[in-house]
Amino acid sequence: MDVSLDGKVALVTGAGPNIGSGIALALSRYGAKVACNDLVPDAAKAAVRRIERNGGIGLALSGDVSVEADVLANIAAVLEAWGRIDIVVNNAAWLHTNHILEEDLASFNRAITIAVNGNFLFTKHAAVAMIERDIRGSIVSILSSNAWQGASGFIAYATHKGGLANFVRAAAMDLAPYGIRVNSFTPAAPRPDNPELLARWRAEGRTELRPPRPPRPDRPSWWRETGTYDVRGNIPMGEPATPTDIGHCIAWLSSDYARLITGCDFVVDGGARAKYWAYTPDADAAAGPVPLIPLDATELADG
């Protein structure tokens, strides 16, 4: 099976520098032209540089996904540049962490507005563009493990991610008569693999798989004592996914091979979500890392 997105145009929101950038690169490596949206213009430009460095074609877009005028301007820019939109990945969100007893309404509303309005606006207006051009497109919303399970300190994030899980199912039903598929993807603490991001972290003296968290005396010991955590011990396959792993899956989900898949959620997490909560994987029995099919030429050069 040779997955190809040749001739297709994709738009990825929240395109930098971690999950969004990885998805954008993957769609490009599988043949799509990719428009990269981010609230921070430099982040969108960095995602496009990564695409172009690997031989792809990208377009940098800046805009607030929760503002309808910005969304319409982004879609118009893609249509003007390439004449069509086949794929949309709704990745933009605000990872705002706070305890329910500490959260304020303004911050709660902001987190909800960015994620929910952003998914609604891009899904609606991209679908209109697809229908007008008789395109049977693919729309993917990026969720989180917090959509399905509770974690202390993520009240706003869990609320909007959980809500989006059902938004996807409802949107899938609305758009099915037009041949437009709507699905979701649930990351689970992915390990960053963007060479530019990792280089910046090294320059800042970071050595962990994930960036340090601020000290919080009210949080569990793994947070309180080190400010970081390592999730590998809770993953049955012993290794967290990367944005590259996520990108491979979303590229396939956006291809014609997935033509009848809609209203579904996909997860690439080494078995983390399927794991019984009390089960701790035996690290000594782990088979070891499965070889990764890389997408970034810089990663190939470094390896």
Task: Go through each PLM region and give its residues.
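Alpha-helical segment proximal to the catalytic Tyr-Lys
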Residues: V128, E132, M173-P177, R259
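Residue(s) in the substrate-gating loop at a strand-loop-helix junction
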Residues: S144
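Substrate-binding pocket helix/loop in short-chain dehydrogenase/reductase
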Residues: H99-I100, D104-I112, V231
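Short C-terminal tail/terminal secondary-structure segment
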Residues: A251, T262-G303
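Canonical Rossmann dinucleotide-binding motif of NAD(H)/NADP(H)-dependent dehydrogenases/reductases
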Residues: V3-A35
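Active-site helix of classical SDR
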Residues: T123, H160, V168
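C-terminal substrate-recognition "lid" of short-chain dehydrogenase/reductases
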Residues: S4, F120, R181, M237-V268, ...
